[in-house]
């Protein structure tokens, strides 16, 4: 009969607080990915390491409400709340995607009190690359 393998605690149960100590981050990059279905906000330091993130889905919105401007605004507020506590004062903003949450997310970032060094649209545009999918007939 084989020996029973001791169960290693799962990731969900193993961590109560933050893994790393709260480090001071004076400058960072805020990435906003706004699709038609959801808005994802990721805050990184200048080297690209993720400090905080949030999305409309994790902010409590479900279904089609995740794509709304108000959901994007709430997601930005949740993501930025933690980095302001860590001392972030200046940030660059990278906005990607065609969604409704683009402008609302940018407005929420401006209202948060973080000084924006620049705002860049990094939406991927094909230079006539792959053939797009056929149009829907509803």
Swiss-Prot record:
Belongs to the universal ribosomal protein uS11 family. GO terms for molecular function: rRNA binding; structural constituent of ribosome. It is found in: Plastid, Chloroplast. NCBIfam families: PRK05309.1, uS11_bact. Pfam families: Ribosomal_S11. Keywords: Chloroplast, Plastid, Ribonucleoprotein, Ribosomal protein, RNA-binding, rRNA-binding. Its main location: plastid. This is Small ribosomal subunit protein uS11c. InterPro entries: Ribosomal_uS11, Ribosomal_uS11_bac-type, Ribosomal_uS11_CS, Ribosomal_uS11_sf. Residues 9-22 have a biased composition (Basic residues). Transmembrane segments: none annotated. One of its GO terms (cellular component) is chloroplast. The gene is rps11. Part of the 30S ribosomal subunit. One of its GO terms (biological process) is translation. Residues 1-22 are annotated as: Disordered.
């Amino acid at each position: 009969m084989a020996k029973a393998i001791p169960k290693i605690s799962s990731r969900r149960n193993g961590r109560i607080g933050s893994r790393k100590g709260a480090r001071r981050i004076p400058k960072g990059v805020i990435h906003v990915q706004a699709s038609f279905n959801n808005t994802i906000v990721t805050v990184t330091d200048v080297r690209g390491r993720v400090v905080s993130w949030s999305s409309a889905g994790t902010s409590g919105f479900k279904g089609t409400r995740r794509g709304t401007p108000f959901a994007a605004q709430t997601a930005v507020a949740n993501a930025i709340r933690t980095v302001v506590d860590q001392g972030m004062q200046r940030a660059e903003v990278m906005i990607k995607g065609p969604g409704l949450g683009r402008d609302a997310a940018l407005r929420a970032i401006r209202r948060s009190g973080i000084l924006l060094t620049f705002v860049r649209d990094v939406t991927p545009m094909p230079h006539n690359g792959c053939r797009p999918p056929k149009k829907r007939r509803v």
